[in-house]
């Protein structure tokens, strides 16, 4: 015992970081081990986890989750076309505005979403200017609904209106379809809350030139295998949420023969190619629709604890669970932590927003950051942290997708099928990398970073699942 006190002190601190912080101030070597008790100490959650682990319920959950995992992995999404939302999106009307995240009223919409809504109303000709659009949005005459409830996903504000052209992605394995609108690229754009005349002019051009060209090109091409293209893009250094250099190159390569043969004037062809070349984000929405098509195939499986939706609207974060179809489990939207563009401060940023977390729900984006170490230049952190995120996410998922792999981790399949019981039991929250929109309407993107869902979403989902299935 006496020799113990004559040796250098090396401390491992488990849990509360204040103890390790105090030791560091005294120049004592200390290793901080992040740990939280199951359920983050909530005994109701711990009790629910114990109840769900009892037979025969645990066996039913395991069988349901095996099926959900299989459906995600076996899903084979392909791009089959483009068309206007009014023609293809279930439930779309001329006075419907779809938005990102769980349901939200006009009064509770954040600045970026309100900016996008008013811009869309002007674009659709439903309002003569932004002031008129604000009055219309508040009047009750416009139907607001989540994209996810219409087989859609929407980037950032996610605002989708009748005239906008949509990707049409079909799951060849199960037959379901998913939709998302086109990338406006990375300038002052509607999805970030900008809504001045330059934004409206771009939307008009996308409706009148870009959309029809893509539609007619796909009539010639037939279909594009998105699952194969995704796997290639990850092997080329993308994570296919915020880094899309390879994916956009592959997508425009596949589209080019059809675009050239579609019969449009050379001047318009040049406009389209210059537009695509202006930003690597052109393929970003494509991956979102691909992931949505795969995850919807796993939604609605009785007894399954698999997360099929993670989405944010700048006000709340929402989850949907396979075994509890039609229900949202929400918590407060979080602050995104990451580098800001020059001239902006963290206090300028809006809260977490967008349906693009469907990529992480599928297993790419933040879950696949080990494929894209260069992403840290945009979202912050280190290469080592990016790699660790991919390893850590495997702890809260049911398996790996062998169709989409991570070369740096010995070609491990992407972590697939987030399980609410694993999240609740471990305290490990899904990691999401995302853009940051300004808190006020009319400005746009001001940075990017890392964010996690609030634990309360998983807590609510778990307790509701227990109440539904534990008899």
Where on the chain are the PLM-derived regions?
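Anaerobic metallocofactor- and corrinoid-dependent redox/one-carbon enzyme cores
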Residues: 2-471
